[in-house]
């Protein structure tokens, strides 16, 4: 056999080997994508994802957060899809140092940096802070704050919100299956976040500090509580205790109405109504159910 013939034979065999390798790889990928492992939280199909935030409201005219960046962490390892707690050991401090690790890769979903008035996002009002597409299971959300955070008190005075250190300007939210609302038919996922403004802001020696408390919830796995407080213009403060040491706050609107979402299932909630100059009232043994709305009877405060 001539040298030319040998070279041609080698070339043909190399091309055939490459073709077989590519074909085999494609078959494995298609088989993995069609295995259905991602059907519970995030399928291999490209999904539209939205990050939506709301708040407890606060005893301020405004609570302005300087949101610089919003990101999601996608788990690129399909072998962990059935383990809802896989990323629980993912260290937030480690995430400060790199964009990818064994738990996934960070991806920006944020819009342009903007100031958001968290005091206005109460009683069911929400704000879209991020939207993008994702192909893999989302394990975490990261919100990076800037330095222009401040509050406006009820007298109209503006006060800067001081962050204790650089770590606190980055908010991490872990996600589990119950925290995600998913429309499989629409290839859509929604991540609802609740900012606990009341417990996140502290006043010490005339200085307001921000220690952000943000938790995820879903409409499908958490309950919603609504009610009405009279007189309408008393600026009622509502405390909701789940009986397990967790308290969520709400501030009634000018018409006396309030709405709180993201409440865990339970049958021992206590709801307390307070207003300056009025007698405090309580409702005991309030029941919350997954995916359902609980509407309280109207409460009339007396002086």
PLM regions: where:
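Bacterial N-terminal signal peptides that target proteins for export
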Residues: 2-15
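C-terminal motif of bacterial Sec signal peptides marking the signal peptidase cleavage site
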Residues: 22-25
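A short, solvent-exposed, low-complexity linear motif enriched for acidic/polar residues
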Residues: 27-254, 259-266, 270, 275-279, ...
